[in-house]
A protein has these predicted regions:
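Conserved SAM-binding loop
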Residues: 1-97, 107-125, 134-141
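Short glycine-enriched loop/turn motifs at secondary-structure junctions
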Residues: 102-105
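Rossmann-like AdoMet/SAM-dependent catalytic core
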Residues: 115-183
Length: 183
């Protein structure tokens, strides 16, 4: 809804590739990239670094950045739109034992953000910041019309089911592409 189904998208730090596969199955041209994980579900749709990308998705990635500003700078060389999830820290900042998102059991969450943090990052890179929910965000050069943001929030009442009927799966065409490559 916010970005066209005819665009090209990259799922960064995509893990095993399940999100890429699911998005391709409903008709979006998504590609996989992850330097730490094997692509199991979207093999054949690895990102070609010479291809244009309209937007990058990053789910549960920002909190792992050791140097967020540099990471964002590098991502913006690929696309001027980042669609991502990360929980905003509560205000006041909770003690470690009082907020599950610190991830003390695994120690992998090392960067935490507030709405103000993302507003400052947006300003630094001349982007717009859209806080869709407290855990879903967009940083983009594009101006997103306020009505589109409101419609996006309607997914809570089932709007996504209507949109889903308008999409065409890439499952069959991907099967052909994959099997043709393996001949």
């Amino acid at each position: 809804l916010l970005f066209g189904k005819n665009g090209r998208y990259l799922d960064y730090a995509a893990g095993y590739g399940i999100f890429v596969r699911l998005m391709r199955d409903i008709g979006f041209d998504f590609f996989w990239d992850d330097k730490y994980t094997q692509n199991l579900f979207s093999s054949g749709f690895e990102w070609d670094q010479n291809s244009d990308i309209d937007a990058i998705t990053l789910f549960e990635v920002f909190e792992h950045f050791g140097d967020p500003i540099n990471e964002i700078k590098n991502l913006l060389k690929i696309s001027d739109t980042l669609i991502f999830s990360t929980d905003l820290h509560p205000n006041p900042l909770p003690k470690p034992k009082d907020w599950w998102y610190y991830g003390l059991d695994h120690g992998q969450h090392i960067a935490f953000y507030s709405r103000k943090t993302f507003e400052l990052i947006a300003k630094k890179f001349d982007l717009n910041y859209y806080g869709i929910t407290p855990s879903f965000h967009i940083l983009s050069k594009k101006n997103i019309a306020p009505y589109k943001l409101k419609i996006t929030r309607l997914s809570k009442i089932g709007l996504h089911k209507i949109i889903y009927t308008l999409l065409q799966s890439k499952t069959e065409s991907d099967h052909y592409l994959i099997t043709k490559k393996s001949l």
